[in-house]
Amino acid sequence: MMNLNLLLSKPCQASTTRNELETGSSDACPRTIFIFARGSTEAGNMGALVGPFTANALESAYGASNVWVQGVGGPYTAGLVENALPAGTSQAAIREAQRLFNLAASKCPNTPITAGGYSQGAAVMSNAIPGLSAAVQDQIKGVVLFGYTKNLQNGGRIPNFPTSKTTIYCETGDLVCNGTLIITPAHLLYSDEAAVQAPTFLRAQIDSA
């Protein structure tokens, strides 16, 4: 089971909320849209441990006005108990992520969509994406998952989605990647991958789209 004390012992970092997809105009579509689902107990709709690092790197590469960053919030409350559900998160969270992907495709049908998820947020993405239409899946050019809680169960991939469009980061010693819900210190150490390797992969996917 989850070690809540260890999870909450991580020093507090500023959380972030981003809603450019929700507020952006279809008349000013960006170079890419980045949709991210935070980990359990993280505040805002982006969290602070992973998502903002990747978002900031994409903005540095393309310019802030050329990247819409959108966190999965609302019905996705990122509670701890939802990790124990069969999908590793709630159906409401999955539907909310799907709504955002569909919104991106309808607002900006020619814009490459990228996405990411951390911990429970990785489960949100791995459940949401397979349920999208083929057209929307095709518009998703790259997905990065960190501390993937369904990594073992899903064979190290997003079901029914190209592995060439997916990169999964699992730190040595992060036991959630081995099919458990045991939180070890390694589960909190993805900032480097989020800041460098993940955006590098996403940029390559965007630029080749």
Swiss-Prot record:
Residue pairs linked by disulfide bridges in the UniProt entry: C29-C108, C170-C177
Catalytic site: S119, D174, H187
Group of enzyme by EC: hydrolase
Keywords: Disulfide bond, Hydrolase, Secreted, Serine esterase, Signal, Virulence
Gene Ontology cellular component list: extracellular region
Localization terms from the record: Secreted
Single biological process term from Gene Ontology: carbohydrate catabolic process
GO-annotated molecular function: cutinase activity
Main location: secreted
Recorded catalytic activity of this chain's protein: cutin + H2O = cutin monomers
Entry function: Catalyzes the hydrolysis of complex carboxylic polyesters found in the cell wall of plants. Degrades cutin, a macromolecule that forms the structure of the plant cuticle. Allows pathogenic fungi to penetrate through the cuticular barrier into the host plant during the initial stage of fungal infection.
Name of the protein in its database record: Cutinase
Organism: Alternaria brassicicola (Dark leaf spot agent)
Lineage: Eukaryota, Fungi, Dikarya, Ascomycota, Pezizomycotina
